[in-house]
């Protein structure tokens, strides 16, 4: 008694084809950037004539606080925070903390520090992950040019 396995026809997705053609182009562009880090390309001032990909990033940062902590925001600060975007609110909180130290932090520095901390936390949770301490120090101490 032979049981035949039913065969299903799978159609190719046009999205899959687009991804397969786009990813090698992206890899080639990344390799070019790695080979020429000081290239003439200014990503902040692109003309309308050149093609580029713009990616929007949404990042949320929550810091765990004790339940018995009292919010230091006054009513006016809360109202002001509602009128600005989430990223601006986070930057203001971050800069208000660092103003006491006399530092003004750029958005790039802010994101770099938060992403580095998140990556470090992920590495600490993975028991099998191993990273060279010199690499970690280099990641933490690297500053972007302003």
Curated annotation (Swiss-Prot):
Basic and acidic residues biased stretches: 119-128
A GO term for molecular function: box C/D methylation guide snoRNP complex binding
Coiled-coil stretches noted in the UniProt entry, renumbered to this chain: none
Transmembrane parts of this sequence: none
Cysteines engaged in disulfide bonds, as pairs: none
UniProt record, GO biological process: box C/D snoRNP assembly
Pfam short name (any one): NOPCHAP1
Region: Disordered, residue numbers: 119-146
Matches recorded under InterPro entries: NOPCHAP1
Classification via PANTHER family: NOP PROTEIN CHAPERONE 1 (PTHR28674:SF1), SIMILAR TO DNA SEGMENT, CHR 10, WAYNE STATE UNIVERSITY 102,-EXPRESSED (PTHR28674)
Protein name per Swiss-Prot or TrEMBL: Uncharacterized protein new4
Lineage summary: Eukaryota, Fungi, Dikarya, Ascomycota, Taphrinomycotina
């Amino acid at each position: 008694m032979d049981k035949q396995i039913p065969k299903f026809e799978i159609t190719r997705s046009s999205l899959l084809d687009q991804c397969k053609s786009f990813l090698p182009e992206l890899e080639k562009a990344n390799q070019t950037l790695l080979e020429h880090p000081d290239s003439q390309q200014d990503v902040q001032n692109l003309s309308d004539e050149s093609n580029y990909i713009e990616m929007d990033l949404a990042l949320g940062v929550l810091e765990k606080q004790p339940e018995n902590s009292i919010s230091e925001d006054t009513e006016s600060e809360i109202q002001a925070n509602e009128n600005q975007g989430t990223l601006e609110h986070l930057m203001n909180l971050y800069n208000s903390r660092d103003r006491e130290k006399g530092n003004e932090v750029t958005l790039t520095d802010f994101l770099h520090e938060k992403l580095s901390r998140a990556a470090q936390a992920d590495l600490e949770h993975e028991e099998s992950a191993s990273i060279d301490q010199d690499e970690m120090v280099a990641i933490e101490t690297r500053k972007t040019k302003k």
